[in-house]
Each structure stands twice: as C-alpha cells, then as structure tokens.
A protein has these predicted regions:
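Long, low-complexity, Lys/Arg-enriched
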Residues: 1-71, 88, 92-132
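Gly/Ser/Thr-rich loops at beta-strand to alpha-helix junctions
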Residues: 19-21, 75-84
Length: 132
C-alpha cells in the first residue's frame, strides 16, 4: 500500500457517505480503524435539479470542512458528480481518499405467484484508493 502517515495528518478516518459507521460490519470498522478513529460526516442530499455550479460549491464547502480536520483518510461515496468534485479537491490538498469495495451476494426466490424476489447483501472486502 502506498499510503503513509505523515506529521500533518490527524488520527481520524472520515466517513463521508450515506452509510453511518454504526451500521458497518465489524470487518469494515476494523479496516477503517487501521487509519484512525472513525468520524461520520453525513453525505449531503444532492437535488437532481442542482446545477453543476451548485454541486461544485457544495463540494468546496465540504472540502474546507474536511481539510480543517486533518484526516488520515476520507471515505467518500455517493452522488457521482459531487463525489468527483470533492475527491479532486481533497487529493489536490494531499488528502488520501478511498471508496469501499464490497462483494454483492444475491439470493433469488421464485414465489408461487410467479414473481421473483431478490435479496442483495453487500459484504465489505477492502478500501480502494482514489488516484485522480
């Protein structure tokens, strides 16, 4: 792994996603805690009619908030254009950013009425670094 802690980094792992860490699997919590104490920072609701300028502005505001905390690592996942805008800003400032990688396991049940019911389960496997 090419991530290295330096003297500027704090000791926190910021979870900037729609998935509160309280609901994570033990494997995901353990993996995050290798980088620092987990701090949840709620992912914003991005309106579908938001303009590119509005999304960029929101990314800038949250980049400033994140950078001020001097995180060791940031998990950033959610609406694509906002995620891209934020990740780009964080990497430009030397902040390491990751996405969670999960295996999707699907159970399919065929019901007596002919319908099909699918249950999806996501099993955390690792964090993958963004390299923009």
């Amino acid at each position: 792994m090419w991530w290295e802690r330096d003297e500027v980094m704090g000791d926190i792992f910021i979870n900037h996603s729609n998935h509160p860490s309280a609901l994570w699997s033990e494997d995901e919590k353990r993996a995050a805690e290798e980088y620092g104490r987990i701090v949840d920072m709620a992912f914003p609701a991005i309106p579908p009619l938001a303009t590119e300028i509005e999304v960029e502005g929101l990314a800038e505001v949250n980049a400033v908030r994140i950078i001020a905390q001097k995180p060791a690592l940031v998990l950033c996942q959610g609406e694509y254009t906002y995620t891209y805008a934020l990740v780009k800003r964080l990497i430009e400032k030397g902040i390491y950013v990751v996405a969670a990688c999960s295996e999707r396991v699907v159970e399919e049940h065929h019901e007596p009425d002919g319908s099909t019911r699918r249950i999806s389960q996501f099993r955390f496997k690792r964090f993958r670094f963004y390299d923009c």
